[in-house]
Amino acid sequence: AMAAPKSHFGAARAVPDGGSLTVIATALVETESRMDDVIFEEFKGTGNAELRLVRELADRRIYPAVDVAASGTRREELLATPEVVSARQELRRRLVGLPASQGMETLLGLLRRSKSNAELLKPA
């Protein structure tokens, strides 16, 4: 039953001569439905990136309602220079130990005080 949907997710790739095919999917978790959990676990490893949303943040009107520590991309080293990757990882380490709401509020504060991504990621 999962073979057809998994083949669709596997279709995401770079297209010769430029461009790419991007597949975006959502999964509702923590529903207390065993079937939802099974489906989520089946597809979890097929993505290249995961953006984990947090209901608590949305309820508090903190946007984007993203759990920074639980969100990320695989193979980040292919997307930026080693220096940028290192700076991103350092920022993530600073946020990882915080509750999701405090982590996002901290990140939003840093973003407000920065004029650019380069400034945000500059070593302290």
PLM feature segments, named:
Residues 1-124:
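P-loop NTPase catalytic core
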